[in-house]
């Protein structure tokens, strides 16, 4: 089934309105995936699949978009493709709640970071306060060096 049909089917199941086909076109254009509309989902790269699934969720204009590990198991090219698209979304009126274990992909688009360990909050605040060597040692039990390069985090394990 091609991407456009997957969106159409989703809209149909959710009480498709007359304007849903137009919404699909607009969202695909906004997410820069119009060129994928006739491709079979199973032939897309993992990054393209992630973006198309995010786009599908946006059709109904949610106030909050929940992303669970949006860049897990992606190669670097696909990771940055997804990160760039999420960055674009952050400029719209959609709030984004992102769950991730990959701290290096937390970008400047997230204005609040909550760090959990065993279901308890161990740090909460803006990312410059939360993402630091002390909190990461507490979270993972290893010593690391943390740097931020233009909004992208670099975490390097330190030898004991």
Residue locations for each model-derived region?
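Conserved ABC ATPase signature
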Residues: 40-44
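A short, surface-exposed alpha-helical micro-motif characterized by mixed small hydrophobic
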Residues: 106-108
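ABC ATPase nucleotide-binding domains
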Residues: 139-160
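Catalytic Walker B motif of ABC-type/P-loop ATPase nucleotide-binding domains
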Residues: 65-69
């Amino acid at each position: 089934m091609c991407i456009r049909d997957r969106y159409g089917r989703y809209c149909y199941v959710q009480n498709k309105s007359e304007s849903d086909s137009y919404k699909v076109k607009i969202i695909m254009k906004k997410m820069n995936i119009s060129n994928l509309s006739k491709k079979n989902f199973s032939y897309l790269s993992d990054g393209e699949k992630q973006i198309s699934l995010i786009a599908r969720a946006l059709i109904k204009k949610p106030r909050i978009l929940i992303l669970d590990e949006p860049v897990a198991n992606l190669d670097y090219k696909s990771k940055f493709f997804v990160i760039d698209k999420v960055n674009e979304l952050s400029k719209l009126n959609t709030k984004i709640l992102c769950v991730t274990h990959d701290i290096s992909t937390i970008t400047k688009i997230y204005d609040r970071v909550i760090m959990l360990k065993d279901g308890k909050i161990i740090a909460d605040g803006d990312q410059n306060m939360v993402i630091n060597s002390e909190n990461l040692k507490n979270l993972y039990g290893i010593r690391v060096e943390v740097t931020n390069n233009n909004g992208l985090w670099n975490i390097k394990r330190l030898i004991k």
